[in-house]
Regions:
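An active-site-proximal structural segment forming one wall of the substrate-binding cleft
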Residues: 107-112, 116-118, 130-159, 175-194, ...
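N-terminal substrate-binding region of glycoside hydrolase catalytic domains
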Residues: 29-159, 164-170, 205, 209-211, ...
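Substrate-binding cleft/loops of secretory-pathway carbohydrate-active enzymes
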Residues: 209-240, 334-342
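Bacterial N-terminal signal peptides that target proteins for export
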Residues: 1-11
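Glycoside hydrolase catalytic-domain groove-lining segments
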Residues: 72, 229, 238-298, 318
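Aromatic-rich peripheral "rim/lid" segments of glycoside hydrolase catalytic domains that contact
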Residues: 32, 36, 59-78, 163-164, ...
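Aromatic-lined carbohydrate-recognition surfaces of secreted/lumenal glycan-active proteins
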Residues: 183-221, 276-296, 323-335
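Bacterial N-terminal signal peptides
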Residues: 9-19
Length: 373
C-alpha cells in the first residue's frame, strides 16, 4: 500500500470520527479538534534541516548532491546577527552503523567551524536481522551519543522519528517492530551516555507525525504512558511535532483556515489531549521539530510558501507561553529536486541550484523578530 493510500485511510477514519462526535474537543478521547488557549507569546529557538530531505515511502527518491560551500554560504546568510540557528541533522540510521556515525561527526565539525550548533536525529531503521533487538539498538544509541555528544556544538538528540506513523519506513520508524519500546530504551540509553560525558544539559526528545488515525494516535500515547519508566520520564526534555498542513495533514487546505490555524490546533491537541494520555506534563517542552510547505505546481506557489511560513511561525510564537513551545525547525533548507514528484521534493527555502525563494528572506526576518538570542 502506498503512502497516499494510507493517507486516504487515515482521512476516512478522521472524517468518520468527526461525524460521530461533532462536538469533540481537546478533552475528548480521540482529540479531534480544539481551540487554542489564550495567546501568551514568547521567543523561539529557531533551526532548519540542511542536507537531503527523505522521500515518502520505502526508498529514497531523486535528490541533487549537496554542495557544501553553497550550503554554508546560505546558512550564514540565513542566521541574523545576535540570533542562533540550530541545524537539525536527520537520518542517522541504525543500519548505517559506525560508518554513518563518523560521517555525521564530520558534518557536525564542519558546521561548528561556521559557528553553527547541531542536533542529531538518531533513527531506529534497523539493520537486516536486527529489527526488534533492543539491546543491539541501545548499543548503537550509546555509540552515536558517545561519538557525537562529546562535541560542544551538539545541543540535542531526537531518538527515533515519527514512531506513531506506521507507513513510509524511509522517513518514519513506526513501520518497524517494537519501535515505541526502542524510543523509550533509546532515550534512557542516550541520557546515561550524556551523563557519563558530563553533558547532562544536552536535550533529549522524540518526534511524532501529525497525524495518523484517531484510534492509532490515541493508542500510541496510551501505550507510551504504560511503557514509560521513571528513568525515561526524568530523561525526556521535549516532544517534537512534525506538522505539514496541506501536505500530510490535512492533505488539502480547509477553506477559511490558515496554515497557522492548523499548526496551532495540532500543538494544542498534542499538549492538552495527547501528552496527558502518557502522563507527560509541563515539565516536557513542546517543539515543532519539522514544518514545511512545498512549492509544487498546482499545489502551492513560492509566494504561497512564504505566506504559510510566516503564518505558521507567528502562530508558534503567539502560543509559546501558553503551550510551552520552545523550538521551531523548518524542513528543509534546499529542494531535493525542484522538478521532482515526491511529496518533499520542493519544501526547501532554496531551489535545487541554491537560489533563494521568497520564503528564505521571510524566515530570516522571523528569526530576527521572534528568535531567542
Amino acid at each position: 500500500m502506498t503512502f497516499r493510500q494510507h493517507l486516504v485511510i487515515a482521512i476516512g477514519a478522521l472524517v468518520s470520527a468527526a461525524a460521530l462526535a461533532p462536538a469533540a474537543s481537546a478533552q475528548g478521547g480521540d482529540c479531534l479538534t480544539a481551540d487554542p488557549p489564550s495567546a501568551e507569546p514568547g521567543t523561539i529557538n529557531f533551526g532548519i534541516t540542511p542536507g537531503i530531505a527523505g522521500s515518502a515511502g520505502v526508498g529514497q527518491g531523486t535528490a541533487l548532491p549537496v554542495i557544501n560551500k553553497a550550503e554554508r554560504q546560505a546558512l550564514e546568510r540565513l542566521e541574523p546577527r545576535g540570533r542562533d540557528l540550530v541545524l537539525r541533522l536527520n537520518r542517522l540510521f541504525w543500519d548505517g552503523g559506525g560508518k554513518l556515525i563518523r560521517k555525521f561527526a564530520n558534518r557536525v565539525d564542519r558546521y561548528a567551524r561556521s559557528g553553527l550548533k547541531s542536533e542529531i536525529q538518531v533513527r531506529y531503521h534497523p539493520p537486516e536481522g536486527k529489527e526488534g533487538n533492543l539491546r543491539a539498538w541501545a548499543r548503537f544509541v550509546r555509540k552515536a551519543v558517545r561519538r557525537l555528544g562529546r562535541r560542544p556544538s551538539v545541543s540535542a538528540f531526537s531518538i527515533t522519528n515519527e514512531i506513531n506513523f506506521p507507513v513510509s519506513p524511509n522517513t518514519s520508524d513506526g513501520s518497524y517492530d517494537r519501535a515505541l519500546e526502542a524510543m523509550v530504551r533509546g532515550v534512557v540509553a542516550a541520557n546515561r551516555e550524556l551523563r557519563l560525558l558530563g553533558r547532562p544539559n544536552v536535550e533529549l526528545g522524540f518526534s511524532v507525525a501529525w497525524r495518523f488515525t484517531p484510534d492509532a494516535d490515541r493508542n500510541f500515547w496510551e501505550d507510551l504512558g504504560e511503557l514509560a519508566t521513571p528513568r525515561y520520564r526524568r530523561a525526556l526534555d521535549y516532544v517534537g511535532v512534525q506538522v505539514y498542513p496541506g501536505l500530510v495533514w490535512p492533505p488539502v487546505e480547509i477553506p477559511g483556515r490558515t496554515a497557522g490555524d492548523e499548526v496551532a490546533e495540532a500543538l494544542t491537541l498534542v499538549r492538552g489531549c495527547y501528552m496527558p494520555k502518557a502522563d507527560l506534563g509541563d515539565e516536557v517542552d513542546l517543539w515543532v521539530s519539522e514544518n514545511g510547505y512545498p512549492t509544487k505546481p498546482g499545489v502551492n506557489s513560492e509566494a504561497g510558501q512564504a505566506e504559510r511560513l510566516v503564518s505558521s511561525v507567528n502562530a508558534v510564537a503567539a502560543h509559546a507561553g501558553d503551550l510551552g513551545i520552545t523550538d521551531y525547525r523548518w524542513f528543509n533548507l534546499r529542494d531535493n529536486d525542484s522538478d521532482g514528484a515526491d511529496l518533499f521534493s520542493q519544501v526547501g527555502l532554496l531551489r535545487d541550484d541554491y537560489s533563494p525563494k521568497p520564503a528564505f528572506a521571510e524566515y530570516r526576518r522571523a528569526i530576527r523578530r521572534l528568535g531567542d538570542s
